[in-house]
Regions:
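Active-site-adjacent helix-turn-beta-strand microarchitecture at beta-sheet edges
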Residues: 281, 287-393, 399-400, 415
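S-adenosyl-L-methionine-dependent nucleic acid methyltransferase catalytic domains
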Residues: 1-290, 373-724
């Protein structure tokens, strides 16, 4: 019998229905933008009060601090709308239909709209529309100012991951090609021709470490303005400048808002004259440490492995459970009462018992107390809490598989930072997008994201990475499947409330029990279970003592029966131990049921029958126009003011016109070649020449010659204006 082909997985994507974003213009609608909307707004950020805590000083800072930081906030323009799921669904539909023609799909970009009316499409910055994630080309300082001032995102970002240049040798590490990560500073054929990058590089390094610190502080000020009160910022830096950058962040965020300095082990050590550097530093600051959102990360304990985790659980009980003995003594009163245990009275040698008299009795009944030579100890099992809290030393996150970018961050580092400081549906920002690691991680874990970069190469790589990514489909807590799974985990009836697939309700996470001494000591059900089983155990103990002429207490009864015991006595002994083990199992079950649980936020349950692709996102830029050329002092080089005879510009345009006169224009097909009968210069702002040629039917046609920049690309708006 022929085997039936397996059906493909269902393809889904996460959507953020309760989130929205401001309606901004696509590039082709630039001419419909009102003049006041085209003009960049000026956003002023207050400088830090110099009378506060000590701060870092660099060349020119005193002059800068005399006035607020003023940033131009130009409008943003959408260059491209991308919805991977819609594209995949369309391909599947076409493949299924075969050669059958299909009607035009008019709602391809419906997920991007959500506007109240058709007229609202051209009323920019006045309405909200459906949320879509964003990649933005431009200076991160201006972009962040525009997001805050024009789009109302001030105080709306939950987490920022900032991986700036480390400021070591002040060389260019801009990747010049999407197909090669080989970057050699000073090599002519690897020099970037992107004006945004050239300007960013010059602005950052024009004065060495002094301009670098100015670059960082300005962006940290703008980033803080975007953070919500419970928000976090993570800044990754090398050990060469971590002391300077931490001083900067103290200045911007306040010394009281430092959360942690995280040491991140790298894949390999950087060679040095003395000790090799094997770690980077991730500085974690909060907007307000008292309001900080924090989700504790954990790692699994393994018996015999890991200092402070599983290594000390070196003993086993009869059920093969790993355990270790820990102290029962605390430095805090009260708790200095005597305790009778196994026929002997005990007191704490120094300090106080960790629990009261009633609690101590329950610990004893639960089998959690053991006697040493001079004190009592508490038996802690490995599975009481089979995980341990991750500290600020991260040795398990090194490496970035399949690098496509010269400075690509390890995804595990970004993932842990995002999971610690945000929830599904929260907004994550990355001012230095690079290859899109932050976007990829945020997309995987259901966060909204905005990434910014000055490099077209970086955004092209990030765009391709997100478009082609596949993610696990995690069970939403606000879904029928999620409610069913939650009910199974908690042994309760599923909630009858309706579901809406709201991602802000989170996922259904794996969890581990967290059994503590306190939870056992306060578990009154242990007393009830103990009393119930005593009615069975005590008569059996008395029978055993009578038959063997013993006075054994419960803890003195041997585990194995002796060979010379009569069969009847051996049966009583076996019955007693059977009841004793059953009592312990019931007590252990009660302890586990009443213990707290800790969620493993990096281990949500997955629906294996579904696969997920990225949700809708847009590619945007600061301006639809090409970037103008500036001098070393940032003054604009205006070719129109310099006249049409400007050296270089005229030579390049004349060279193109001469080539067109001789070679014409060769299009895709040989028969579509255009040969000009006449071609002359044209004194226009956009058109550089006017030519005439014969069409296929012999009629005379006129063509305007539009010549783009010698170094750079032609924008869509320039083409539209030239065509008009």
């Amino acid at each position: 019998m022929a085997k039936q082909p397996a059906s493909g997985k269902q393809i889904e994507s996460f959507v953020h229905d309760d989130a929205s974003r401001r309606n901004i213009p696509p590039a082709e609608y630039q001419t419909m933008l009102r003049n006041q909307e085209k003009t960049p707004l000026q956003v002023a950020y207050e400088r830090r009060n110099p009378d506060l805590d000590p701060q870092l000083i660099w060349r020119g800072k005193d002059l800068l601090d005399e006035s607020p930081l003023v940033v131009n906030a130009p409008p943003l323009y959408i260059q491209e709308k991308i919805h991977p799921k819609v594209l995949i669904d369309d391909l599947k539909r076409r493949a299924k239909a075969g050669a059958t023609p299909e009607p035009l799909q008019t709602d391809l970009f419906a997920s991007f709209n959500g506007l109240p009316s058709e007229e609202a499409k051209t009323e920019f910055y006045q309405h909200d529309q459906n949320w879509s994630n964003r990649m933005i080309l431009g200076d991160s300082l201006q972009v962040m100012a525009s997001l805050a001032e024009r789009e109302g995102l001030r105080g709306k970002v939950q987490c920022i991951y900032f991986d700036p240049p480390y400021g070591i040798k002040f060389n260019s590490n801009f990747q010049w090609s999407t197909t090669s990560r080989d970057v050699k500073d000073g090599k002519p054929d690897q020099i970037t021709r992107e004006p945004e990058q050239v300007k960013a590089f010059r602005d950052t390094w024009r004065d060495g470490i002094h301009s670098y610190l100015e670059y960082l502080r300005d962006r940290l000020i703008a980033a803080r303005d975007l953070l919500t009160d419970s928000g976090s910022i993570f800044l990754q830096i090398g050990d060469e400048n971590v002391h300077r950058v931490r001083s900067l962040m103290d200045e911007v965020f306040g010394t009281e808002n430092i959360v942690c300095e995280i040491v991140v082990q790298k894949t390999g050590g950087q060679s040095a004259r003395f000790l090799s550097s094997v770690a980077d530093i991730c500085l974690w600051y909060s907007k307000s440490v008292d309001l900080l959102k924090y989700r504790q990360p954990y790692r699994d304990k393994t018996a015999g492995i890991g200092h402070g985790s599983g290594a000390r659980y070196d003993q086993k009980d009869e059920a093969d459970r790993h355990y270790r003995w820990t102290s029962l003594v605390s430095s805090r009163p009260p708790g200095s009462f005597p305790v009778d245990f196994h026929g002997k009275q005990w007191r704490p040698r120094a300090g106080y018992w960790k629990t009261g008299e009633e609690g101590f009795g329950r610990l004893t009944k639960a089998g959690r107390i053991g006697a040493g030579r001079s004190t009592l100890s508490y038996k802690r099992f490995l599975d009481d809490f089979p995980a341990y809290e991750i500290s600020n030393l991260w040795t398990d996150v090194a490496g970035s598989p399949d690098k496509v970018y010269v400075v690509q961050t390890a995804p595990a580092v970004v993932q842990r930072c995002i999971l610690m400081a945000s929830d599904p549906g929260d907004l994550v920002l990355d001012p230095t997008c690079g290859s899109g690691t932050t976007a990829a991680v945020a997309e995987q874990w259901g966060r909204r994201w905005i990434t910014i970069d000055t490099s077209r190469v970086a955004l092209a790589l990030a765009r391709a990475r997100i478009m082609g990514a596949r993610y696990p489909y995690y069970l939403l807590a606000d879904s029928a499947e999620g409610k069913q799974k939650e009910a199974e985990l908690t042994r309760t009836i599923p909630s009858p409330d309706p579901v809406s697939q709201n991602i802000r309700q989170g996922f259904v996470y794996e969890r581990v029990p967290h059994i503590t001494l306190k939870s056992i000591a306060n578990n009154t059900e242990i007393d009830t279970i103990w009393d119930k089983w005593q009615n069975s155990l005590e008569p059996l103990r008395e029978q055993l003592n009578t038959a063997l002429d013993k006075t054994w207490q419960e803890w003195e009864i041997p585990r194995e029966a002796q060979a010379n015991w009569p069969d009847a006595v051996r049966q009583v002994h076996a019955n007693w131990w059977e009841a004793r083990i059953a009592r312990q199992k019931e007590i252990d079950a009660s302890i586990a049921a009443k213990a707290d649980s800790e969620y493993l936020y990096d281990k949500p349950y997955e629906d294996k029958g579904k696969v997920r692709v990225a949700g809708p996102f847009t590619v945007e830029s600061l301006s639809p126009h090409r970037t103008m050329i500036v001098n070393d002092d940032d003054t604009l080089i205006d070719s129109h003011k310099q006249g049409a005879t400007a050296e270089g510009a005229t030579d390049f345009a004349q060279m193109i016109l001469n080539t067109l006169r001789v070679a014409g224009v060769q299009q895709a097909h040989k028969q579509d070649r255009i040969n000009f009968e006449s071609l002359e210069g044209w004194p226009g702002n956009l058109l550089a020449g006017k030519g005439s040629y014969r069409d296929a039917d012999g009629s005379l046609k006129t063509a305007g010659i539009f010549i783009g920049p010698e170094f750079g690309t032609v924008s869509r708006v320039d083409l539209v204006e030239a065509a008009r």
